[in-house]
Amino acid sequence: MEALGNFDYESYTNFTKLPSSQWGDQFLKFSIADSDFDVLEREIEVLKPKVRENIFVSSSTDKDAMKKTILSIHFLDSLGLSYHFEKEIEESLKHAFEKIEDLIADENKLHTISTIFRVFRTYGYYMSSDVFKIFKGDDGKFKESLIEDVKGMLSFYEAVHFGTTTDHILDEALSFTLNHLESLATGRRASPPHISKLIQNALHIPQHRNIQALVAREYISFYEHEEDHDETLLKLAKLNFKFLQLHYFQELKTITMWWTKLDHTSNLPPNFRERTVETWFAALMMYFEPQFSLGRIMSAKLYLVITFLDDACDTYGSISEVESLADCLERWDPDYMENLQGHMKTAFKFVMYLFKEYEEILRSQGRSFVLEKMIEEFKIIARKNLELVKWARGGHVPSFDEYIESGGAEIGTYATIACSIMGLGEIGKKEAFEWLISRPKLVRILGAKTRLMDDIADFEEDMEKGYTANALNYYMNEHGVTKEEASRELEKMNGDMNKIVNEECLKITTMPRRILMQSVNYARSLDVLYTADDVYNHREGKLKEYMRLLLVDPILL
């Protein structure tokens, strides 16, 4: 693709200059040889059979052995190792769940029950939350004696976040655990440092809402300070994460080289967002495993294009210009590009360039059918971009529900999930894309959740720009409430949506677990992006911390 042409700065109004990328080209400096991967991979393969034998080779009729296996599966998940043992985990949990009543009949430890609950719900088994009733006293409240069990309280708090719309006991548990965990983390009753840190991490973002790469890195630091940790398991976790880091550095180098070759930065006007590292981080949220390295690269490139398109339409395009771009994308024909001018023409060329890359990759995989699905999802983004631009500038005021429905598509929710399924390789079959395009409840909820969280985070900035297409703004106008009242209501909606996501993942039986996990991982990405601040757009703070944790802080063997 040729270098981008200069944009018309005269049309630049109401927008302030954004800072240039803090990362620059530093990832171009890394040089990783194939032998670096080979050395770590050999060490990993030596340890895997030992871990497998320690965890999964036990008596299938021994209740205590089954409990121990389930608790060990929790360690595998938390340490980022479960993808090495998927078959063993599946078989063990299937067998254990068939005997679930007998398994927990005499169990009265909060930590054990909470962890078993978490593991089964993680893997799609509906274990009833009634199991927690045994921890209530005669007054119907949770027993105060539970507070002394720090790890039990933490695991109970983590279990709460697997709740559905009917798990009312977990709503009670949330208040109970929150009230006490904060003092266990930092107050006068503070736990040992490594446990306090784990509690603080959970209070910021619980494991079920956090992305797997961050959970693994944080949990490795916790686990090695546990007196009863398994040395073999810990070593495997450390080697595995170092192996992941090599892939991550290689991917960042590839994406940075691709972006540099296109020469975007030298010609971009001041409000176009340069987000090479941020888009890679967003892709990492969808899958962290090494076998999906190409998928992360493909996803990061799509996010760069979506960001570029969003800036072109929201910031620089007049309604007529955005209409012309949407029309060209609808036709998907390069011959119509001559009808476009300046930045709209460049945006169209950028889209065509990326999808040509996709076409070549998918053809080599024998999966050309995916391209048609991806093109359709991208056309939807273009249509919804136009719709929101018209609402923001044309005077039409949509209802809150109408805006949320369109806004979820415009922000790229469906295209993001589709791209992540594309990156799964052979796992991403035609049926998965047809399921996504049918817009099941799970997917629609994720679109709405994205729109809500993004608009809550960016409300002040949107209003400063004069950009009125914002969920808070529409809710305030429709219901005649203050910003604070609207914020509380939207936060409540977001909490309810989390429960629906959990509920739908337990209900859906027609899709492979890995496909559903892409939806779960997408939901997790929203919490990571927006819990502290808008990580994608505000690069200081949490993003810097996350990148340091994932790529800079050493893991000592």
Curated annotation (Swiss-Prot):
Gene that produces this protein: BS
Record pathway: Secondary metabolite biosynthesis; terpenoid biosynthesis
Keywords: Cytoplasm, Lyase, Magnesium, Manganese, Metal-binding
GO cellular component entries: cytoplasm; plasmodesma
Matches recorded under InterPro entries: Isoprenoid_synthase_dom_sf (IPR008949), Terpene_cyclase-like_1_C (IPR034741), Terpene_cyclase_plant_C1 (IPR044814), Terpene_synth_N (IPR001906), Terpene_synth_N_sf (IPR036965), Terpene_synthase-like (IPR050148), Terpene_synthase_metal-bd (IPR005630), Terpenoid_cyclase/PrenylTrfase (IPR008930)
Mutant lacking the gene: phenotype: Does not emit any sesquiterpene volatiles except (E)-beta-caryophyllene, alpha-copaene and alpha-humulene.
Binding residue positions for Mg(2+) 3: 454-455, 462
Annotated binding of (2E,6E)-farnesyl diphosphate, by residue: 273, 310, 314, 451, 454
Function: Involved in the biosynthesis of over 15 sesquiterpenes (C15). The major products are (+)-alpha-barbatene (27.3%), (+)-thujopsene (17.8%) and (+)-beta-chamigrene (9.9%). Can use farnesyl diphosphate or geranyl diphosphate as substrates, but not geranylgeranyl diphosphate.
Protein name, UniProt field: Alpha-barbatene synthase
PANTHER family: OS04G0344100 PROTEIN-RELATED (PTHR31225), TERPENOID SYNTHASE 9 (PTHR31225:SF242)
Keyword presence, S-adenosyl-L-methionine: no
GO term, biological process aspect, one: sesquiterpene biosynthetic process
UniProt subunit comment: Monomer.
